[in-house]
């Protein structure tokens, strides 16, 4: 606190001195501005000293030198805060401009442990400035656009749990450096009950001294998970707009104005900055192509191609309609976010909340878009802090989304996870409040969403049974798609994951493998009897010339017989050599599929 008081005293005294110089200068040397004269632009701190060499007046020269000295004193005082933490400020050094940073051989050895711990090279991060510059990957047109100065203020919310301190602080510095002062209401750091000591008093002392009055720290008393931690951040926010970000991002210049402008035009828009990648091993910033954000029927998020109308417009600066969001960053009007029920607090940890928000926003009167004119770089960690059993939480959360929002299409989520529609064995909690929310908001149905927002999503309404498929002569093995390049179905010890997801349809097709996602990506393949081979083929259904060769007669606990050849899918026991899946004349073997749909 003493050092901060000294800085404040220095500021006041020097400002008084500078004001005196300016008044004296104005009285003694009045300057008439002639027609056509241009005012000088305000220059960065580093350029101020250079101006004194061209000054026409010794008094002006003294003023400029004193201003430069004042800035240097303040900068050195503040920079001392980061040095006490072993960190670096300033715009140069390793990784400048988003280039890959490197370590010496001896440093690389020291970096291995922290790298494994955090899922990124935290040791290297400490050698990179908190203020480093990164590339501006915005489309050229974006840099020419002008925005109103009367935009709403934003509260930037970072969520962290056991992150490296340098990475958190670089996120904060980047937000401050690249968000106009009059638009940045506050920064809120939500600590989801971290264990690391450096994230307690050292973090709090640094941000309060470095950015007094700007940064709030909210601490959860127990580990809540990303979803509920974001809700806590929203509760603490006072800005008209709230931006939610992972605490391992860096912002590009000009990121905020286009986002806030779009929300000012329509408060029901949820805006996603375009995402670039920060490589977790060397912190190089890589440009990602403009994309929309979609998902699979398991509700795993993914990048998808922008819709056709965006491509047809031929303008890469235009907003991109998106069905959902990846989840590492989104910006929304604070009140509107509350009106639509925030994120689902009944979900655990994370996974699915990003899909739920996209569906809910579209069905309940809003929209969601990716903005190429706003770019944020994000570290994709190879290890995540909530890793323990994250698959279970994602599955549970996905079922909550399905039950509340997907109407008849909820079956697709159960199929994708290979779970029975009734009694799936997972307690998803009470969803009555979320269903009541949907009703009170008078939201559209999920069919409308698929038709108008996510028409690329594949649909599987023709499914009449799904799950593991077992033969009565070999009950410990299941039908499996085997290596993709072999195009041949096999038998494999049962595990119930995607390669063993069999799906029998009304048309008599027998599909094998995880559900497809969008129509632009390959679909699940069909089991085929080509009449020549003893081995059942797995082929693209649309490329099989004879419809009969891909159609099968099958009833539960009965034979699986091809309609074109009359041969049956059976198993052949070869003793020590194992069990083969073959096609041959029917011998009465029976098959059972796990989940018939009633």
UniProtKB/Swiss-Prot annotation:
The keyword Disulfide bond is annotated on this UniProt entry: yes
GO molecular function terms listed in the Swiss-Prot or TrEMBL record: carbohydrate binding; metal ion binding; polypeptide N-acetylgalactosaminyltransferase activity
Keyword flag Signal: no
Pathway assignment: Protein modification; protein glycosylation
Domain of life of the organism encoding this protein: Eukaryota
Ranges where the record places region Catalytic subdomain A: 151-262
UniProt cross-references to InterPro entries, sorted A to Z: GalNAc-T, Glyco_trans_2-like, Nucleotide-diphossugar_trans, Ricin_B-like_lectins, Ricin_B_lectin
S-S pairs: 142-373, 364-443, 478-494, 526-541, 568-586
Location (main, coarse): Golgi
Protein keywords: Disulfide bond, Glycoprotein, Glycosyltransferase, Golgi apparatus, Lectin, Manganese, Membrane, Metal-binding, Signal-anchor, Transferase, Transmembrane, Transmembrane helix
Top-level EC class: transferase
Binding positions for Mn(2+) per the UniProt entry: 246, 248, 378
Annotated localization: Golgi apparatus membrane
One Pfam family from the record: Glycos_transf_2
Names of required cofactors: Mn(2+)
Gene3D superfamilies the record matches: 2.80.10.50, Spore Coat Polysaccharide Biosynthesis Protein SpsA, Chain A
GO CC list: Golgi membrane
Comment block on domains: There are two conserved domains in the glycosyltransferase region: the N-terminal domain (domain A, also called GT1 motif), which is probably involved in manganese coordination and substrate binding and the C-terminal domain (domain B, also called Gal/GalNAc-T motif), which is probably involved in catalytic reaction and UDP-Gal binding. The ricin B-type lectin domain binds to GalNAc and contributes to the glycopeptide specificity.
Similarity remark: Belongs to the glycosyltransferase 2 family. GalNAc-T subfamily.
Protein name, as recorded: Polypeptide N-acetylgalactosaminyltransferase 17
Lineage: Eukaryota, Metazoa, Chordata, Craniata, Vertebrata
